[in-house]
C-alpha cells in the first residue's frame, strides 16, 4: 500500500490521476482477492504454465481477449490443453473488474485518510465505528427531538449505465480507465443484471459486488453533492475539491460554508438554505433531510432536489419519491426500528406560599420501538411460529444434534436482542424470546419423540441459559441478586458500534 501511495502522490504533472498502469501490476489482484501480497497465491498465478514475471502480459492478454468476442468460444479440447484458456467470458470480466475496483478505491482511501488526519487533536469517532448501523441512532436521539419536518427521500437509481461512468469522470481523469469501465458496464445486457430495486434498498448481483458497490456509492455521493452544488455556483458539478463524504462528520461543515458563500452573493435566496437545524442521514437506499423549518420551506427543498437531479443526471425523477412528514405525527420504519418523536408529559408540583399547583411540561422524545408484528411475520416466514405468533417446531433442524439446535436458536435470540438493544420498550422482545425458546423445545421434543413438558423436565434450566443475552449474563454474573434499579440499566437503550448489517429477521421488508 505504501508503494501505491507513493505512486499516487500529487506532483506538478498530476500523474496520480492516471490509474490505468496499475491494472498491469500483479499485486493489485492479490489485494483484490484478499490474498495479501503473496504473489504465489494470486488468482492470476493459480493457473499452471505462468510465472511471476508474466503478470503484465497476462493482464494485457486478458483485456485483449475481452475485446475479441470470437476468442471466447473455446472448444473443450482446447480448454483441456490449457486451463487458463478455458476460462469463460464472465471470468475474464470478473478478474479484471475486481482489480479495477481495487485500483479506483485507492484515491478515495488516501483522500479519506488525509481528511481524517486533518482532524488530529479534535474529538471524532474512529472510521470503523462510523460504519456501525447503531452509530446513527445516538445522532437521531440528540437532534431529531427538536425538529419539526422531515423529507423521506428514496434515492433515485441510475437508469442508464453512462450515468455511472460520468459520475466517476470527476474523480478519475484517466481516459483509458474510463473506457475500460464503460466496457465492463456494457458487458451486462441491461441494468437489471447490475442493480435491482425490488426492495426499498438496492441489491447487487453476487458477482463483482465490490465493483458494483463502489460504483453505486460514487453515484450516491454525487446525489448528495446537491448541497455542494450551491457552493460551487455553477451548473457543472465538480466534486474533486471536497474530501470523502462521511455525512455524520462533514455535513455541518458544508452547511456552514454554504451559508458563508451565499451571505456574500445570494442575499435573496439565503433564507432558504440558512437553516442551522438541517440534518441529513442516509441509510440503505433512502435518505432523510430533517429541519426545524416550516412546511413551505421543506416543500421548496423537495422541488429543488427533484429539479436538480433531473437536470444533473438527465433523467425523470418522480416527486412521489420524496415525502414530507411531520415528526410528531408520523412513525417511520428506520433500519428495522419504528422511530417517532413523541410528547411525554411531565407533571411538576410547584408551591408558592400557601398555594400549590401542577405544571404540565411537555417534552419531545425520540423513541425507537421494536416492530413486533412484522418481526413475528419474519419468524413465521422462517417457520419458527405461525402468523399469529404461536411457536411451532422446526422440522428441518431435527436431524442436528441437541447442542447444535439449542445453539442455533440461542444465537438467533441473542442477535435479535443485540440489534434491538436500543429499543425504548423491550417487553416485546421477551415475546420473541418466548417464541424462539418454545420453538426450540418443540423441535427437540419432535426429535426425541416426546412431549414438550417431558423434555423441559429432563433438560431443566440449561435450555434457559442458552437464551440469555449478553447483557443479562453480565448482570446475572456480576449481581446475582440484582435489584430493580440494576435491571433498569438493562432496560435502558444500549447502542453498539460493532453492528455492520441488519439481521435477516429484522430486515422484514
From Swiss-Prot:
Q: Is Phosphoprotein among the key words of this record?
A: no
Localisation: Plastid, Chloroplast
User: Which keywords annotate this record?
Assistant: Chloroplast, mRNA processing, Plastid, RNA-binding, tRNA processing
Coiled-coil residue spans: none
| Annotated GO biological process | mRNA processing; RNA splicing; tRNA processing
UniProt key word Electron transport: no
Q: Which domain of life is it from?
A: Eukaryota
Q: Which is an annotated GO molecular function term of this record? A: RNA binding
Q: What is its main location?
A: plastid
Q: Give the protein's biological function.
A: Usually encoded in the trnK tRNA gene intron. Probably assists in splicing its own and other chloroplast group II introns.
Family from the record: Belongs to the intron maturase 2 family. MatK subfamily.
Q: What is this protein called?
A: Maturase K
Amino acid at each position: 500500500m505504501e508503494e501505491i501511495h507513493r505512486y499516487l502522490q500529487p506532483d506538478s504533472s498530476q500523474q496520480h490521476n492516471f490509474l490505468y498502469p496499475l491494472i498491469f501490476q500483479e499485486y493489485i489482484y492479490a489485494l483484490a482477492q484478499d490474498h495479501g501480497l503473496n504473489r504465489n497465491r494470486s488468482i492470476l498465478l493459480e493457473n499452471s504454465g505462468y510465472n511471476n514475471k508474466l503478470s503484465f502480459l497476462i493482464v494485457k492478454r486478458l483485456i485483449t481477449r475481452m475485446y475479441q468476442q470470437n476468442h471466447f468460444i473455446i472448444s473443450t479440447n482446447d480448454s483441456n490443453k490449457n486451463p487458463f484458456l478455458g476460462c469463460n467470458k464472465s471470468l475474464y470480466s470478473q478478474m479484471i473488474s475486481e482489480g479495477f475496483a481495487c485500483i479506483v478505491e485507492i484515491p478515495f482511501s488516501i483522500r479519506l485518510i488525509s481528511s481524517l488526519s486533518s482532524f488530529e487533536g479534535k474529538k471524532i469517532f474512529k472510521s470503523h465505528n462510523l460504519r456501525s448501523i447503531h452509530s446513527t441512532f445516538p445522532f437521531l436521539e440528540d437532534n431529531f427531538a427538536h425538529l419539526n419536518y422531515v423529507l423521506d427521500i428514496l434515492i433515485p437509481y441510475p437508469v442508464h449505465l453512462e450515468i455511472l461512468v460520468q459520475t466517476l469522470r470527476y474523480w478519475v481523469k484517466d481516459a483509458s480507465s474510463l473506457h475500460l469501465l464503460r466496457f465492463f458496464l456494457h458487458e451486462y445486457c441491461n441494468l437489471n443484471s447490475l442493480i435491482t430495486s425490488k426492495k426499498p434498498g438496492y441489491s447487487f448481483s453476487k458477482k463483482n459486488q465490490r465493483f458494483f458497490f463502489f460504483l453505486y456509492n460514487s453515484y450516491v455521493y454525487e446525489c448528495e453533492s446537491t448541497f455542494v452544488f450551491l457552493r460551487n455556483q455553477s451548473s457543472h458539478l465538480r466534486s474533486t475539491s471536497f474530501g470523502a463524504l462521511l455525512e455524520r462528520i462533514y455535513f455541518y461543515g458544508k452547511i456552514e460554508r454554504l451559508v458563508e458563500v451565499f451571505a456574500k452573493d445570494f442575499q435573496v435566496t439565503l433564507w432558504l438554505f440558512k437553516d442551522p437545524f438541517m440534518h441529513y442521514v442516509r441509510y440503505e437506499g433512502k435518505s432523510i433531510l430533517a429541519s426545524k423549518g416550516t412546511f413551505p420551506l421543506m416543500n421548496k427543498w423537495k422541488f429543488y432536489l427533484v429539479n436538480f437531479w433531473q437536470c444533473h443526471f438527465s433523467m425523470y425523477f418522480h416527486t412521489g419519491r420524496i415525502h414530507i412528514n411531520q415528526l410528531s405525527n408520523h412513525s417511520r420504519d428506520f433500519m428495522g426500528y419504528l422511530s417517532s418523536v413523541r410528547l411525554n408529559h411531565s407533571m411538576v408540583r410547584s408551591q408558592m406560599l400557601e398555594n400549590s399547583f401542577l405544571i404540565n411540561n411537555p417534552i419531545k422524545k425520540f423513541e425507537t420501538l421494536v416492530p413486533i408484528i412484522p418481526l413475528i411475520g419474519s419468524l413465521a416466514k422462517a417457520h419458527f411460529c405461525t402468523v399469529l405468533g404461536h411457536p411451532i417446531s422446526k422440522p428441518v433442524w431435527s436431524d442436528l444434534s441437541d447442542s447444535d439446535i439449542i445453539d442455533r436458536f440461542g444465537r438467533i435470540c441473542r442477535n435479535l436482542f443485540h440489534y434491538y438493544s436500543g429499543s425504548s420498550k423491550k417487553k416485546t422482545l421477551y415475546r420473541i424470546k418466548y417464541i424462539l425458546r418454545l420453538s426450540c423445545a418443540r423441535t427437540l421434543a419432535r426429535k426425541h419423540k416426546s412431549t414438550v413438558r417431558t423434555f423441559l423436565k429432563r433438560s431443566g434450566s440449561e435450555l434457559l441459559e442458552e437464551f440469555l443475552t449478553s447483557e443479562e449474563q453480565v448482570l446475572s454474573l456480576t449481581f446475582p441478586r440484582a435489584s430493580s434499579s440494576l435491571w433498569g440499566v438493562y432496560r435502558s437503550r444500549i447502542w453498539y458500534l460493532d453492528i455492520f448489517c441488519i439481521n435477516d429477521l429484522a430486515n422484514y421488508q
